[in-house]
């Protein structure tokens, strides 16, 4: 036992953890596949459930209030490490992975639920006949989450093992570094702790005190304001520590692809639309638009039109991804079929670190969950109409299964799931099909939103879960245990999210404007005209789809480019800054070994920035939830919100950002 403890105290990720394997080379995880380690026990399960409840509540509140859902994996990993250290638990690495895996259901379920289901409450103001309940919200989230897990498991080996070193997995990398540094203890965890403290404090000052702006824009100077107003050209960069760290881990190559997509939208399409349609009101698919294109701000043109091109690009990139992944999908289904016939290999022959839930259980489980979803649609959503329920379950099954690989792929590349874009496409497709079979009006809206909620949660869960499985692969946990206990976390998170959503609706009301819920408002804006025969921006979707095909033919990663077109500019530019730091610190020395060590140290610093920023995001959310913003203001710690409208707040932001970058570079070169 003492020997094992010493081994874990000196744990270190193998040299080949993040690079592609050479021919014949195998990856040996931190925890040996030939040994058994503590993973699932009362400690890890209770802590996992507690994390799922706490982070679901915090993420739901923050997501509905400002539209941002933080990823919970990293802060949960930090808490798990802290709790096991305080309790002096030995060999806690496997337990901490399980705590993180159960708890991380929170972010996935929250994203799935709040992107779609609040649209029911938003549309209720216009259509009082639309009603929902806790049980509907819970079932849509829970069934979608469980489907996401079941549909992803057959692709685990491909994404985490077969593609080893080919994808950056930024969030999984950061979380793994947190868990490993916690297991190491002592001096080896110092870079992570230092950067976590700096990054956390930096982002907390912005989020809670507002001492400087979170973005630096070209509007900081007079000519920049004129350029934005007249030419619709604007430059924006988020100066947060967490996004900078994310850029470092993504790397310069993928960051550039993403940023080029963003610049194509913001510097070509947005100004181009203003020039071409300056005095026209383009509201064929959204009657709420009353301004001419020329009267809009660049941000409004992006939200109203250009972003739809990104959605079309993501959808087509997803379809291309499905076509390219068809062999993997076919092999996964074939393997499941062989197991069902009893021709699969014995579980005892498979390494501990490669054991998944039996495909027989996955197949039977999928059928049961789909049957339950069908019954839910038939009795709770479609009011007993068999045709509508059958069409609904077919749409949900096909879209959720096929787009599972797209969600996992996006997380593997940028750590960001374009789930809202894919869900918007699902809603549009569902609305068109349901109207075609005769379900329209408010009843059709409710049905499409519930269906969208199931799909959205399934895709969100698939993207989140591939992160957990990659962490487990690097560290050497048993996949079957992660997969089995993920279901519990999903149910707990779904119940918590349903409760918080109803509580916030009763307290503030989604139609009041107190809750931003931007994604749900976007869904409501799209679905209302569709269900009433107005239509969708098919031309814009088509342009995005065509662009994705051209990019693919030119060997440019279409999904990364389309993600850049969909995600706001200010969140894409810092990825390039972080990627450039990565390139700089790993190429300055003539000694390859020095460059390698600096790169690894940089990964620790970046992980600390992400971890600190994410953890402080939770703290800020809890302060807002408790209403302590007024107390901070009374204490003189926070500045008035009007300060952010002052250009000087952006100047302060740029100065702080430069100091943060200099700190990053300096610490990596020690």
Regions found by a protein language model. Give the residues of each.
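Alpha-helical multipass membrane-protein architecture
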Residues: 1-670
